[in-house]
From Swiss-Prot:
EC number: 1.14.13.9
Name the UniProt record assigns to this protein: Kynurenine 3-monooxygenase
Organism, scientific name: Legionella pneumophila (strain Lens)
Known catalytic reactions: L-kynurenine + NADPH + O2 + H(+) = 3-hydroxy-L-kynurenine + NADP(+) + H2O
Keyword Flavoprotein attached: yes
Amino acid sequence: MKHITIIGAGLAGTLCGLYLARRGYEVELFESRPDIRNSPTDYGRSINLALSCRGITALKAMNLLSEVNKIMVPMRARAIHEANGEIHYQPFGRHIDEYINAISRSDLNALLLNKAKLCPNIKLHFNMKLHSLDIHNKKIKFENKNGDFVEASYHRLIGADGAPSHVRDMLKNEGIVSASRDFLSHGYKELSISKKHTKGMAREHLHLWPRDSFMLLGNPNPDDSITGSLFLANEGKDSFAELNNEEKLHLFFKTQFPDAYAAMPNLVQEFFGNPTGHLSTIQCSPWYYKDECLLIGDAAHGIIPFFGQGMNSAFEDCRILDELLDEYQDDWSRVNSVFYEHRKVNTDAIAKMSMDNYHEIHSDIRNPKFILQKQIERELMLRYPEHYVSMHVLVMFTNTPYAKAMAIGELQSGLLEQICFPITDIKELNWQEVEKLLSLYDKKLAKII
């Protein structure tokens, strides 16, 4: 029987359903929320996401990229806004054609759902909240929007219901998986930066206003407005709890983000009206039960958003699952275990790299030593493209396994420390000495590759 039930019709669940439908499976998608195509809100979730190589590869394999291209905006570099008004620029890639893309979560989800609706072997069900799961008898019970319960049987189940996954929690309650969700002490809130006031802000850039313990991030939209995300402690000094009235809010933004503040006419309404989102990392082991149930995406390995890889790693799940189904001729008893073994080490790696990037964006990004290392790293990639490709480039612009990219990054960190140790300016570099260090680096790199 080729029937699959997917819990969650967000980005990962819907793309996974499209992949499986292409293989001839009868797919049913159940979503707890209303159909996002008919809703004016995004349920308080992150509005803009970063689409890079891994996600693009997965979409391209389903012939979806040409349509997705129409709703995304290139981000070619970071624009770092200092409190004193200075702006510094840091390119993401090695050249102008290497960039990440800002895309609306709701627009992309709607596009995928429209594709699913056109697929004769996909059925979509909305307002169906998972109430219980009988994993041993393959029974599921949903609560619909009227409060009525609907029971169903399944042949094979995929949990793609995000970081707060009910499927994962129910597997945990049965003792089938071990799982935890670790929250950061910071949360985030979506705020808009008006297109009428963004003329002084570079287009096609990811805008960052990093401060000591908090940060404002801005993703560009197709209409030239910017979607801002304020990352702030939940409690204590400079926190969401502290900014509890309009006077404090205005003073905080005017002092910390003066150029953004001037472009935020709806700041008060949005700050006090929009929900505060949570930031968390999911640890889960294993991700499957026999050949009958599998977790993917954030439900299995949710991460904090500071490397822009949450959606990309979830889409990569879909692509790799499809490739394994090819390799093992749809033998799910083998596919589930191999998928977990292959992906777990890599998603653990991107979870760690995302946490490291969180610290980098918050504080390191303005450190003179860090800036020097980035300058040298970029020069290494330009001078020695066959020898040196940075960890960030490997993560964002290639499909190199995350674990390998992280191992290479650790090696590069040591190399950059050696190169930078005696200098304070890139002009002081002795490139003959650098080439000697690079030769040693190549030998160590060969063991990883």
